[in-house]
Amino acid sequence: MKFELNHDWQGNMSSPRSTLGDKTKIHLFLILAIVWVFTGLVGNSPWIPAESENVSMVMDIVSSNSIIAPLAASQDSINNPPLYPFIGATFVKIFSSILAPHDAIRLSNFIWISLTLVSIGLMTRELWGTGFGRQAGLIFIASIGLIFNVHTIRPEVSALLGFALALYGFALYYRRPFRASLV
């Protein structure tokens, strides 16, 4: 039985391939990430019960300036840290003339998720070397559970950034301990 291999071992007959440079890959990844983050942020009303509770907490900050203990209408104690409602209230005040309050709060998720993507990319670059940050960002974007939860009004989005920054600090510790302690 005879096998015939038609392979050009020297590369004489191969057609020239156009290769993409690193800057082009970074630009394409940034465009993909921006489109992915912005896709579900505006245009839909809060449909999960936790979203309306968080909108109520942000509107309590906006209307009565209760920055000490922002509470939702049905709460008597603080369940989540107030950083997410504070940033959401800032976005509501900035974009109140253009967007509905729940859309402005969702727009603050752009900041949280962008910083999370950057932190994950830096952590991966620190652990595995240059060129792997984009791959980790693509894996992060492709996570099934993330797609449903990133575009909602939840304080867990800011906690995700905290975890990503902590992991980046742990990865950076051996090479630059002072900078890692600042992260």
PLM features: residue spans?
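Membrane-integral, polyisoprenol-dependent glycosyltransferases
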Residues: 2-183
